[in-house]
Amino acid sequence: KNPITPIEPVSSMPFPERLLSGHIKNKNIEIHTTHVPPGSSNGVIKVQHFEKLYEFLANRKDVQKILTGDFNSPKLERETGEIITWGQKVSSSGKVRIAVNPKWKNECSGERWDSAERSIIQNHKDLGLVDIFREKNGYVDNSGSWFTNKGIARRYDHVFGPKNISILESYYDQKPREQKYSDHSPLVAEFNIL
């Protein structure tokens, strides 16, 4: 019905195969899906992935975009909308400060790590995108796509869409994760582009 033409991968990205992009023929819209490497095992590569992804999308401002994937970020979202990245640390009193895993401190500062994650997770608006789940559910919904061993929900999987969108529904389907098909719950997003 609407064939998709592949878009050349970002060769400067550490793992270019972790970003797949296509242009929908007969429509002025691109679809991008990514799997950002986890920082715990890849360190600065995660930061570089975010930086290259943002740069790639920022250079494509003339076309509407949908961006999906496993971003392995953020660490935490508060009900106020505040985002805590993996470049930050939260003290027992709740105070937030810039920090980075000591394992990676020689490769990447906490400031750079924080900025790289925010470039997409928080500053997606600069790319003409909205966070479909948050637009539909606000910040009081603390659903997640991945859970720690202590049961803490983390919202690592996202769908960002163009601003001219009518969102019908968006939720994390916990059943596939509970049935052990994946360690992540898929994000369901149904919407119309106006």
Which sequence ranges carry the predicted segments?
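Active-site beta-strand termini and strand-to-loop segments that position acidic
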Residues: 1-2, 22-27, 161-163, 182, ...
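Short hydrophobic/aromatic beta-strand or adjacent loop that forms the aromatic wall/cage
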Residues: 16-21, 153-158, 182-188
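Active-site metal-binding loops of divalent metal-dependent hydrolases
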Residues: 36, 70-71, 185
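Acidic carboxylate-rich catalytic motifs and surrounding loops in phosphoryl-/glycosyl-chemistry enzymes
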Residues: 8-11, 131-141, 171-176
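Short proline/glycine-enriched turn/loop segments at secondary-structure junctions
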Residues: 146-150, 176-181
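Structured beta-strand-rich core segments of catalytic domains in phosphoester-bond hydrolases
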Residues: 1-41
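Low-complexity, intrinsically disordered Gly/Pro/Thr-rich segments
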Residues: 166-177, 186
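Metal-dependent phosphoesterases centered on the DNase I-like endonuclease/exonuclease/phosphatase
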Residues: 51-156, 161-162
